[in-house]
Swiss-Prot record:
Gene from which this protein is expressed: ATG5
InterPro entries on file: Atg5 (IPR007239), ATG5_HBR (IPR048940), Atg5_HR (IPR042526), ATG5_UblA (IPR048939), Atg5_UblA_dom_sf (IPR042527)
Location, primary (coarse class): membrane
GO CC, alphabetical: Atg12-Atg5-Atg16 complex; autophagosome; cytosol; fungal biofilm matrix; mitochondria-associated endoplasmic reticulum membrane contact site; phagophore; phagophore assembly site membrane; vacuole-isolation membrane contact site
Keyword DNA-binding tagged: no
Compartments (UniProt record): Preautophagosomal structure membrane
Domain of life from the UniProt record: Eukaryota
Protein name as annotated: Autophagy protein 5
Length: 270
């Protein structure tokens, strides 16, 4: 896992997004409702909603600013919570329970999603009311929680300036790893109190099932084997067999593979 930090950071997923006909003026053919973009694994899909809508601005039923709080993404009629990093969402719904690298024949080259709207908002999706600033605040709030788990207090995040917070966010949106990590490394301790981990049920469901244990820094395999019902987990698109990590500390895995919200996201049969 030597170069895994930047390899994961530079990873991206090809996405085709089909807009709900209710977002568009009448008579738009189905082919014109499609938008193709590439979304970084280490990002939130909601960051790209303004770009998706901008591509079809000329045929939108309303102004982009009016639509943003009313839309969300779905996959096979399952609403996707943007609050989970995009790479993790992809892994949950695309074969993590079988082992992502187990069969290239079944590998999805383009993830096909829908951008939908309805009168009733799904309970597992946070409405975007304050635009991109809401996403930035959400990410820093998540880091505040993780800082408490790691250090026993949130002081390291609380002491960050607004400019520091903006640099973290700009690092994510501008794909500048140096800018992002320059601030984040000030939050991480040499010796953690506990480790923030989010374990997701493989293959998802109407609502992603997630357990968030705060684990002590034992070996990686020892820390998670009592929670999962498989001999491997998936993290950042990597299939990790527990037997291979009996001598690797959980914090070492966390340090290399934690996501932009501060959590180490693992996907497994629960």
């Amino acid at each position: 896992m030597g170069d895994s930090k930047e390899l994961v950071w530079n990873g991206s997923i090809n996405v085709q997004i089909k807009l709900d006909s209710r977002l568009l003026v009448d008579g738009v053919p189905e082919g014109r409702r499609l938008v193709n973009i590439r979304v970084p694994r280490e990002s939130h899909i909601a960051i790209y909603t303004p770009l998706v809508l901008e591509r079809l601005r000329n045929v939108l039923r309303s102004d982009i600013e009016e639509l943003l709080p009313k839309v969300w993404y779905s996959y096979k009629d399952i609403s996707l919570p943007w609050s989970i990093p995009f790479g993790t969402l992809f892994d949950i719904y695309n074969g993590a329970h079988k082992g992502i690298s187990g069969s290239r024949d079944n590998y999805i080259n383009v993830w096909k999603l829908n951008l939908v709207t309805d009168e009733k908002f799904p309970i597992n999706v946070i409405p975007i009311i304050e635009g991109q600033d809401q996403l930035r605040k959400f990410m820093m709030q998540s880091w505040k929680q993780c800082c408490f788990i790691l250090n026993g207090s949130s002081k390291r995040v609380m002491s960050l300036s607004l400019q520091d917070s903006l640099e973290v966010w700009e690092g994510v949106t501008e794909r500048d790893y140096a800018k992002y990590s320059g601030v984040i490394k000030r939050i991480l301790p040499r010796t953690p109190r506990r480790i923030p981990v989010a374990i997701h049920a493989a293959n998802g469901g109407p609502i992603v099932q997630t357990t968030e244990p705060t684990l002590t820094d034992t070996s990686f395999s020892q820390a998670v084997e009592g929670i999962v019902k498989a001999d491997f987990v998936v993290c950042q698109g990597i299939v990790m067999y527990l037997r291979d990590f009996s001598d690797t500390s959980l914090y070492d895995v966390y340090d290399k593979l934690h996501s932009i919200d501060g959590y180490l996201h693992l996907i497994a049969n629960l």
